[in-house]
């Protein structure tokens, strides 16, 4: 009798362990899936909902000495599943312009994305407020943060961070861009302002 009870207890433990491992495995698979993503520095017409949301916007960030960089840009990347890994499956780029502390232009050109360093998907954006989305499926808008390695046409290199804090985003994500260009750190993200068409970004999960 005791032997039978022991066998039943052992079987119950095995079944419980199997169920736990199955749940953990499913959660890991869900959080570690490969994502095909489009990113954009957007134009939000009127600087408020419903927009529309168009490609071709601009966003700025400042360096500690008061100088500023303004970027346009868009592209795609494939974010591999698991461990927030990087990828060379990237496209896109944009334009850049730098300004001194007084606001005078000091240079301009283009840049190209060469690598995805990391992408952290936060969540899909909430359906309200409603937007007209002229880029991709409005229901596939996403919040999160992408870190991209970029090559400037003047020979300098940089690391571009694109943050999207749209409707329904959890706290802690900035909205806009931050980048390096050579040794210079343009890390003072210029936030969007209501009614102003600037300093906004978006991700779309393509699949």
Model regions: which residues?
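Bacterial N-terminal signal peptides that target proteins for export
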Residues: 2-15
């Amino acid at each position: 009798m005791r032997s039978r009870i022991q066998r039943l207890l052992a079987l119950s433990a095995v079944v419980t362990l199997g169920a736990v491992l199955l749940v953990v495995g499913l959660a890991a698979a869900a959080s570690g899936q490969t994502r095909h993503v489009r990113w954009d520095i957007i134009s939000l017409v009127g600087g408020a909902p419903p927009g529309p949301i168009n490609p071709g916007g601009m966003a700025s960030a400042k360096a500690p000495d008061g100088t500023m960089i303004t970027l346009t840009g868009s592209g795609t990347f494939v974010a591999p599943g698991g461990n927030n890994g990087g990828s060379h499956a990237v496209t896109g780029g944009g334009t850049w312009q730098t300004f001194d502390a007084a606001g005078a232009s000091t240079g301009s050109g283009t840049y190209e994305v060469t690598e995805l360093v990391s992408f952290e998907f936060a969540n899909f954006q909430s359906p309200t407020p409603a937007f007209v989305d002229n880029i991709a499926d409005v229901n596939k808008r996403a919040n999160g943060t992408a870190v991209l390695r970029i090559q400037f046409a003047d020979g300098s290199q940089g690391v571009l961070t694109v943050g999207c804090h749209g409707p329904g985003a959890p706290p802690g994500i900035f909205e806009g861009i931050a980048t390096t260009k050579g040794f210079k750190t343009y890390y003072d993200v210029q936030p969007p302002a209501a009614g102003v068409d600037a300093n906004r970004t978006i991700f779309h999960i393509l699949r």
